[in-house]
Every structure is written in structure tokens, then in C-alpha cells.
A protein has these predicted regions:
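Active-site rim/loop-helix segments in enzyme catalytic domains that contact anionic ligands
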Residues: 1-113, 141-145, 242
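Metal-dependent de-N-acetylase/amidase catalytic core
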Residues: 2-5, 90-246
Length: 246
């Protein structure tokens, strides 16, 4: 049995950063398990607001259940950490946590799912989000603790020349694997539209940069990029086999 574990900080990260690859692998028979650090309680409420701050976590949980289903995910687990609200000046932060406990939860999830490959955030936290960096660090601590029993660890949003959205890529993580996900754009779009409270966020910056309204579909990547984080040297790359299989 082939099994992959995707670790993300917030609902919608799984769709925007690697949703096409999750859909592709699910279609190829890989069991895709998704774990979210938080329920995104600190995120946007929608434009116009679709809920209030008190209920946003529950709303976003339902949105993520919808999205993971559209991507063909086998399971979705929330670790239960609380996402801090964005500061008045736009400051982002990670949730309160115990590092050893978090890494222990990840180790337990790896063992429970039998994951052979783990996908998570990059070393720069994509656009520098502290919660993304936290998940990256915790995943590597878990892998180091497991040693030879650890899955391959890949980070998404790796950097490469002419990346269409360089702000979302990790400058310190050069791409080792590029995955053409254009055949799965409809599934990824369906998943993105599940995250209705965040749809305005998906297109806001790109609409401003383009000087015209962007659609959610236009904001999605047709090619997703990954950097191998663990181990540094391997003789056989199972993840590459999965994404390259015809």
C-alpha cells in the first residue's frame, strides 16, 4: 500500500500549495492523509463576511473537509492548535505549542498512516509565515527522531526559475521535482472553491498586481514544485516514482 502524509498549518494550504499533486497521487492509488495544525481561526471571515470570529474555526473545518474530499484524500485530522489572529499591522504568528508534543503528534501520525512520503511547508514558510516554518521544523524533528524508519520528507512551493508566483515559493529550497498538475486543475478548483471564506484572499494580491480581477482558477498553479528535505541522499526516490508514473 502506498501512503502519503501532508502536513499543513491552516485550511486551504493543502489546496493552494500542493492540491494538484494530492489529486494526482490519489488518482494513482496513493492513500493521501492530510493533517492540519489549526482550523484557521485567525484567517479572513470572507468578503463580505460569511461568519464571525467566534465561529470561523468551525466554518473553516467544514471547508477543509470539503476540499480534502474533492482532492481524493483518505483522511483529515486537525491537531487542535489555535490559529492566532492577524495583527493590526498584518503581523503573522504561530500558535502556542510545545515543540516536543507537536513532533510527537507528527511521529504518531506517521506510524498510524504508514506514510512513506511526507509533504509539508518549506524552510522559508513560503511567504515567511511563522506557522508554516513551525510545521517545517516539526516535520524534520520527527523525521530525525525516526531515523531509518522515517518517510521521505519533501517540502512544497520550491523555488525555480520563472516561478509564476515567486512570493509563494521558498527561496532556500530549490526544486528537485516539478509536477505537471494541469490535468487536475478542475479538482483543484473545486477544492479551492470549498474554502469560500478565503476565496477573496486567493485573488486579492494577484488582482492588484495584474490591474484586473483575477479568478480563483487563474490563481492556481499548473505546475507544483517540491524540494527533498530528508534524507539528503537516497538511492531510490519513491515520491519521484509516484509523480512520474504514466
Amino acid at each position: 500500500m502506498s501512503s502519503l502524509l501532508c502536513l499543513v498549518a491552516h485550511p486551504d494550504d493543502e489546496t493552494i500549495l500542493c492540491g494538484g499533486t494530492l489529486a494526482l497521487l490519489s488518482a494513482r492509488g496513493v492513500d493521501v492523509h492530510v493533517i492540519a495544525l489549526t482550523r484557521g481561526e485567525g484567517g479572513e471571515l470572507g468578503e463580505p463576511p460569511l461568519t464571525d470570529r467566534e465561529n470561523l474555526g468551525q466554518v473553516r473545518e467544514r471547508e477543509m473537509v470539503c476540499a480534502v474530499g474533492k482532492l481524493g484524500g483518505k483522511s483529515l485530522t486537525f491537531l487542535g492548535y489555535v490559529d492566532p489572529t492577524v495583527g493590526e499591522g498584518g503581523e503573522l504568528s504561530a500558535p502556542a505549542h510545545d515543540p516536543a508534543m507537536l513532533s510527537g503528534q507528527i511521529i504518531a501520525s506517521i506510524k498510524q498512516t504508514g506514510a512513506q512520503v511526507l509533504l509539508t511547508h518549506g524552510s522559508n514558510g513560503e511567504y515567511g509565515h511563522p506557522a508554516h516554518k513551525l510545521m517545517h521544523a516539526a516535520a524534520l524533528i520527527a523525521a530525525a527522531s525516526l531515523g531509518g524508519a522515517a518517510p521521505l520528507v519533501y517540502s512544497f512551493a520550491a523555488s525555480y526559475e520563472n516561478h509564476p508566483y515567486p512570493r509563494l515559493s521558498n527561496a532556500d529550497d530549490p526544486a528537485d521535482v516539478l509536477v505537471d498538475v494541469s490535468n487536475f486543475i478542475d479538482q483543484q478548483l473545486a477544492a479551492a472553491l470549498c474554502h469560500v471564506t478565503q476565496n477573496a484572499l486567493f485573488v486579492r494580491r494577484r488582482s492588484q498586481e495584474a490591474g484586473r480581477p483575477f479568478t480563483v482558477r487563474e490563481a492556481l498553479l499548473m505546475e507544483e514544485s517540491f524540494h527533498r528535505q530528508w534524507p539528503s541522499h537516497i538511492t531510490h526516490d519513491l515520491f519521484l516514482d509516484w509523480v512520474s508514473k504514466k
